[in-house]
Amino acid sequence: MTDFPTKRSLWASNIYCFKNESYLFHESELLDYVYDLKSRSKVSGISSVAKKNLFESQFNFFTSDLPAVQSLKTFCEESLMSVVKDVNGYDDSYMSQLYPDIRESWAHVTNNNGYHDAHKHLNTSWGGIYYLQSGECGEAPDDDGIERMNGTNRFYSPIQYFCLDPSMQYLRHDAVDICPEDGVLVIFPAYLLHSATPYSGKKDRVVISWNSVIQQKA
């Protein structure tokens, strides 16, 4: 016999943030590698209409054998697997049958009001954004003195249609901004629409992003 009333919370969209404790140890080597890619102008050439004043490398960043790159890849993979375990409630036995498959990885360097329009990551399950250099990201006044979000990542609600009457006020926030912090990794469901707001600062905004799926061992 069911005890009524009951409540079921469904279709949650979880965004996780992790701090890389080895950030300072690898920061300079990673930045040098990113700017070396930029100087050689090996750009992705993908969705250029959605980007402005933004360098995007080719999608093979984690294939480099540099120790700093491989250390960051390991950190991202371990963080991703902890997300998979937490969000699904899997036990250690089942987790031992799974492994992360980072399909694409790339660097972004942004300044001079550079931005990336709203988009999703298709055909993958989880996305990651690692803040290598956050610069002056955060709330800042624009040229007209109006406060705006500078270089934040904005995530949009996947719930597209509802009536915003008094009963639905818990859904009133249709977007949330995450302010970059050096050495922080954000992991999010790839179906979430997200963007990078325009950024300007004395230092470039530098991030490493990736797409992934979770595979099961044979």
Where are these regions (language model features)?
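Short hydrophobic/aromatic beta-strand or adjacent loop that forms the aromatic wall/cage
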Residues: A12-Y16, G127, R205
